[in-house]
Amino acid sequence: MANFLFAYRGGNGMASTPEAQEKVMAEWGAWFSTLGSALVDAGKPFAHCQTVHGDGSRTSGGGSGLTGYSVVDAADLAAATDLAKGCPVLADGGSVEVYATIDM
């Protein structure tokens, strides 16, 4: 088994009302429950971002569209990708990038 990073991209962002936010959180909670012991770290959504450049300068925003992350444990990349198929961000117009991590 190995760890894989789910990088969430896009989606419609934060819900506009407390009721809608509660519904979104319930959807994520339900999906996390289906992952069971494979869920290593539920992660966090991303907020503000700055990019640091090689010359030391920085700019606001990342430009990548990443909106959050989670970490799962799976047998291989294919199994991790299968786990990502139920992610709520997919139904919201977003995508999940699945990255294998390397133990160092």
Could you describe each region identified by the protein language model?
Residues 1-104:
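Conserved, structured core segments of small domains
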